[in-house]
Swiss-Prot record:
Biased composition (Low complexity): 19-30
Record-listed Phosphoserine modification sites: S25
Subunit structure and binding partners: Component of the DNA polymerase epsilon complex consisting of four subunits: the catalytic subunit POLE and the accessory subunits POLE2, POLE3 and POLE4. Interaction with POLE3 is a prerequisite for further binding with POLE and POLE2.
Name this protein carries in UniProt: DNA polymerase epsilon subunit 4
Record function comment: Accessory component of the DNA polymerase epsilon complex. Participates in DNA repair and in chromosomal DNA replication.
Residues covered by region (Disordered): 1-36
Amino acid sequence: MAAAAAAGSGTPREEEGPAGEAAASQPQAPTSVPGARLSRLPLARVKALVKADPDVTLAGQEAIFILARAAELFVETIAKDAYCCAQQGKRKTLQRRDLDNAIEAVDEFAFLEGTLD
């Protein structure tokens, strides 16, 4: 009887797959995997950039990580917007003019106007 119920379609076991697959598809907490890279930018490089500011004397690891993550998100956002500009020109390769167009088109990037000149 139990075998017939398990063989039916739509059972939780069939939808989830083996326990290993279900666990692998779930996002892991950052601290659960030792040595996992949490940031794509090298934290030592970000820390060196922060310390290059003469007004900064100390910078904690958490602050460095947050700055690195914010920089990643910023670059991702501007790259996506610039890529949309490239696609409008029927191109796949980003060019400087695509960044200029993205800066002009998106209000959040207004502070960058004139920086690429």
